[in-house]
Amino acid sequence: MRYTHRHARLHEEEEKIVTSTVPPVRVAAVPAAHPYVIAVADPAHVRLLADPQPPGVPAGQWWPPQVLLPAWLKAHAADFDLVHVHFGIESYSPRELAETVETLSALGLPLVYTVHDLENPQLVSQDDHRASLAVLAAGADALITLTGTAADEVREIAHRAPTVIPHPTLLADAARPRGTASDVTRVGVHLRDLRPNIDGVGTTATLVRAVADLRAQGARVEAVVRMNERVRDAEAAASIDLLARDAEGVTVERGERLDDDALARWIADLDACLLPYRHGTQSGWAELCHDLAVPVVSTRVGHIAAQHPTDFHSFDVGEPVSLARAIVDATGPAWSAPGSTAREAEVEHRAVERRAELDAVRAAHVALYRRVIAAEAAA
């Protein structure tokens, strides 16, 4: 779906923004240093407070987020206009977050909550996360989520409608690699550090069998499974190595965590990127793949399919036939081939759309901030 259809409502919000003579909104974001948080903050209208350094942690670590502590809020109430929570709520209990909400209410300062994670990818049990989500959803002055389908789920929890503001590009004006041409179809899956929401073993087992089936049918297809050198589940990593050891056309890469530029180059070399989630809500990886014109193959968890539906091709873990079909469907368009002129043209086309979308996303955030500040002042 093209930008003009997808984001007309955001342009309506942009028209409501007051002139640049109004002081910028001072936002205590949780966290402030996250790439998404930086991307959605209009530098002309929003000033992000730096993440307070928690005691006893390495320099640059923002968690546990100090902004959510009542004592910090009281001590710094004059330094910000609102709190905007994105990530990191697992650092505190639902009861502690209720105290955060109560403190902000007593101070007369608004709370905005973007529901990125209906399920926390860092956790196995979701009970505390759901309870914390309910606390913040009930207490926030405004709720945001990234897709219409996620908004429907948030509405069931909070009994009110969130504002839908889509995930913008995080590349902005950064170079967008086009990938290296190859005479084989290359499918890649990055298992990262095997965090709880990554089904590394199930995904790899299904991929090995799907690649074998496709090659048996004469397809020139290869798969690469990448993991970080340091993983959270060594037993799963060993199983993944074993699954791929004798699998023709499948290789396993182990290495240091890729930085942003290296990750973009790795994805750009693929004809299709496989997402290995067992649970989740929305995916920043799907957004990066969209920017790089790399089709996504994924299980139907959360609301990833709603982010860029025409780029999304689903499969079921344990069903290699469904994965083989998804790979064939995903790699059908000419632009899926890395290093091709069609890929280059598609990347450029999307870059233009995404730059316009980023402006609209930032404007929508500023408009929402102004509304909640005005509502609090009028209360």
Model-identified regions with their sequence ranges:
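Short hydrophobic beta-strand element within catalytic cores of glycosyltransferases
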Residues: 295-300
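Nucleotide-activated donor-binding/catalytic signature segment of Leloir-type glycosyltransferases, i.e.
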Residues: 236-265, 272
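Conserved catalytic-core segment of nucleotide-activated headgroup transferases in glycan assembly
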Residues: 182-242
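Short beta-strand->alpha-helix junction loop in the catalytic core
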Residues: 164-175, 193-195, 230, 366
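A charged, aromatic-enriched C-terminal amphipathic alpha-helix characteristic of glycosyltransferases
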Residues: 318, 332-379
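Acidic donor-binding loop of glycosyltransferase active sites
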Residues: 265-281, 291-294
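Donor nucleotide-sugar binding/catalytic pocket of nucleotide-sugar-dependent glycosyltransferases
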Residues: 138-175, 186
